Amino acid sequence: MTGIDTTKRARLEIAGWSVGDAAEFLGLTPEEAAFVELKLALASYLREVRGARGWTQVEVAGLLGSSQSRVAKMEAADPTVSVDLLVRSLLRLGATREDVGRVIARVA
């Protein structure tokens, strides 16, 4: 588990608290946790690309032939959004394969 110092963790455990991360709480396997992190990273990068180009969600939706609400779901890594859709959308918006590869590599 990361994100909490050992002293604070020990104090919480002594007080009767169980300390863990979201993956532990949800009972995710390491593979499932990695997939969730990958999807979140791609969604975040989509938001970053849109912001860097000064586009609104409506403008991105027009470029992708989609709706603003779908773009919002993509940026939020909604469960209805596939990794495939995120990657194809990033490429359509001008990201390179290398850009997408760097995002994926950061998760590993």
What are these regions (language model features)?
Residues 1-41, 100-108:
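N-terminal flexible/basic segments that precede or flank functional cores
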Residues 11-16, 44-59, 88:
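Short basic helix-loop element that most often maps to the first helix and adjoining turn
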Residues 41-42, 66:
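Alpha-helix N-cap/N′ positions at the starts of helices
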Residues 53-73:
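Short alpha-helical DNA-recognition segment
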Residues 65, 76, 105:
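Residue-level detection of the helix-turn-helix DNA-binding "recognition helix"
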Residues 82-102:
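DNA major-groove recognition helix of helix-turn-helix/homeodomain DNA-binding modules
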